[in-house]
Amino acid sequence: MKKIVLFLGSVLLLASCDVKDPIYNTPHPNHGIVMGLTEWSQRGEGVEVPAEYLVEVSGTTNTANATATATATTTANATTFTMPGLFEPGNVEVLAYNLLAGVSANGGIATVSTGTDGTLLVPDAGVLFSGVATVHVVADDTARVTLAMQQRMREVRFTLTITDGAPERITDIKARLDGVAASINLRTGEVIGNSASVMLSFLRKGDKLSANVWIIGIIEEAKQQIVTTLTFSDNHRIETTTDVTDIFHNFNADKLTPLSITGSLYAPVGTKPDGTIIDWKPGNGDGGDVDTNM
């Protein structure tokens, strides 16, 4: 009888040794975390990688033992990032972008702010980028994603040469470009919204007038035109409006290559010159350099 009891006890002891606690790989066995890498090769020559950028992950998050459908956001200053919080298993969208002064973002749409004169503000420094990808979150694991960041702005360079007349008579030049876009979809790169205008700040050095501006694109359905006002030393002003839609044909297709527009300007010697002294010529429309007459 004692032998039977001892035998049964041994069997129970051995059986209990086979019951083990589950072994997990992470402290979050029912959820996953999201880590990522940003890749910045798609940028124009001389364009720097932003010092910091925002990352949003849309999905079911788990923070402080509460689950909810929300967007987790973090600020990163390196090419790698780790999102805060935990995520339910399943697909989540990861969206990264950098914010510039005068540019806001809401719901994946970036919008350039408007100044007091009704024209778009031009960011003082930096270029807008964004990248998006979908990653599958697995419980008890880390989901890793690589975001190919895309340049979302393009530079326009205006260079005018005063070829005849009296350059010193030009005391001021004001110009604006109409038909540009104010908003862009950070996921797709599509420009949206109504047509807007941006000021062109020309500076004169000797016989050269130059202006550079960064824009997120043009509204293809709108007319692109340049409105220019020249002021001379006798306070006489000449304003012209010229259609330059052909010059900006396919402008949105290549954000990495600046659009360079060159031209010539005649500064009349006499007072109150007659005729139109600004005469923009249509460009070649292929996104390359454009030669105009002014």
Indicate where each model-derived feature is located:
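Structured interaction patches on ligand/partner-binding surfaces of diverse proteins
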Residues: 19-20, 71-73, 101-144, 235-266
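C-terminal motif of bacterial Sec signal peptides marking the signal peptidase cleavage site
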Residues: 13-16
